[in-house]
Amino acid sequence: MTSDATGSELIKSKLVDAPECAGVYQMFDVNKQVIYVGKAKNLKKRLTNYIKLDLDNKTLRMIANTCFLEYSVTSSEVEALLLEAQLIKKFQPKFNILLKDDKSFPFIKLRLDHDFPQLLKYRGRTRTLSDGKFFGPFASATAVNTTLTELQKIFKLRSCTDNYFNSRNRPCLQYEIKRCYAPCISKINKKDYAELVIQVTAFLQGHTKELQENLSKKMEELSSHMYFEEAAEIRDRIKALSYVQLKAGISDIVKDADIMAIVEKNGHYCVEVCLYRAGQACGTIPYFPTAMGNNTKEAILKYFLLQFYQKQQLPSEIIINNEVEDKEDVIEAIKKINNITKLNIILPISGGKAKLVQNATTNALFSLEQYLKKFAKNQEIMLEIKELFDLSEIPERIEIYDNSHIQGKFAVGVMVVAGKSGFDKKEYRVFSLSSHDSITGFSTLTNNLDPVVKQQYDTNGTYNTTVGDDYDMFRQVLTRRLTRLKQEPYKLPSLMIIDGGRGHVGIVKEVMDKFKMNIPFVCMSKGPDRNAGLEQFHMVGKEVFTLDKNLPVMKYLQILRDAAHSFAIKNHRLGRSRTIKLSSLDNIKGIGKTRKKSLLHYFGSYKAVCDATIDELVKVHGISKSLAEMIFRTLHQS
């Protein structure tokens, strides 16, 4: 992958040997990062198009950035389309149409590997799992949680883990509030519980009408035998099912379908996805694919479908509001990705399905309007940030750093990432820090340090972590981050914001000099009395300055800083909690791996061990009365 030619000259040189068959080509920039992936029925013809004169600005910009080019021959155009989709997903090239938010949808899982099956929320692949039944997908975790709550009210199946289930010797709160039949202490037998499992399965599969009819017959039978209390309970279940059915929006038009509506405004696109499973509306979610240059809705929808169904579960049919480019090839590629033989993608003209598509289109337009308002506001803020910090361009990626610790213990550093479209949580990073690492080998770099930082070094050039461990920890974070950026230059931030003061400026400058990097950065410290709105900004070669607390850009910077701070505290607490839980049991004389495992298995959790009485502790195999007293005393002291 080496060549002295670039741009159109490079493409001309590659045309000599380019084959006239189907395949995929990749364009790379000067850093050998993939910037575009394309497929072609005829590679030679497609590459020839890139040396024509009448190209749009996006294509011209892409060609100008191309320093290396590779192509792969495939057996058919469908294979080329499939390979193209996989490479786009893997490399996320900036000149391709991209589906940024591709996290998997959550499901409801009914576990079948236990005598008393558990209902729970599940996120991940379901095709290869055989330990349960899966219902969904749902558009959000909120939709799953709401449905699970309703199911618990109606059917009262357990939701606890096996460890918690096995540790019970009395009913938990779920039983008291009538959301569980407490099978853990045999308040219900296996046969009756199995009947409830059949009922909840029927409901989640959409057989609500048949279920209600069967329950009505059972209610009448119980009444005729004068089991009025049991009959009343089934009556309440029928009423609850009717209410949930009404609220869920059961559809007779579609049973198992994804409805997709694409709309466009000012070069921005929204694809609204409405999920229907077992005739029930499982929620809607808007996507905003990124696309550079001139594109069509047909092309956007094509790449959206290919990327979306690499991860999401396929329904029986996909209903769309717009034609799809290369529709037949797209169908074949999706079938191969999902290893199926049949797939329907339909564009309804009239009837019930057309009305559902129209509703989805209306929702898509509303979602796009809201997105554009937020996008415009973010653009204004980004322009202000560019001018405020003398950046060469409007920032695309801002990285915000903070750390959290207690006197150097349980230390973590974090990186939060934001851009034009808001926070990018997939790019968040956590750095586990060692408070014992000293900064050696930097003695030659200390001469130009800020005096505030320089005083933290001793005469041997070793960093004094007991005085300024916050500097030491941030230096660890930045060193690790810049090391990674050397490997991933395409993720270089436009700006770094550090939660720190003048001393941090010196640390950042020295570490960047060591790596021969020059990333714009600013340190943001709390003002007098740590009051919000009085923050101070520290930059190399500039006097410390503040901003009017009412300026939108100031409020935005506070939001960025607070997001990093919250993320740091959250991860610090998690680490501290894990360490404390581990050490509290491990430090008790007589508690080894086996007894600790027995305690956690019996009680189900560390909290349950802490809550246990001495009499409850001695019930655990291997725990004597004296050891139980020691455990109780130690845990309650800690």
Curated annotation (Swiss-Prot):
It holds the Pfam family HHH_5. This is UvrABC system protein C. InterPro entries: GIY-YIG_endonuc (IPR000305), GIY-YIG_endonuc_sf (IPR035901), GIY-YIG_UvrC_Cho (IPR047296), Hlx-hairpin-Hlx_DNA-bd_motif (IPR003583), RuvA_2-like (IPR010994), UVR_dom (IPR001943), UVR_dom_sf (IPR036876), UvrABC_protein_C (IPR050066). Transmembrane segments: none annotated. The keyword Membrane does not apply. It is found in: Cytoplasm. SMART domains: GIYc, HhH1. It comes from the Bacteria. Its main location: cytoplasm. Interacts with UvrB in an incision complex. The keyword Coiled coil does not apply.
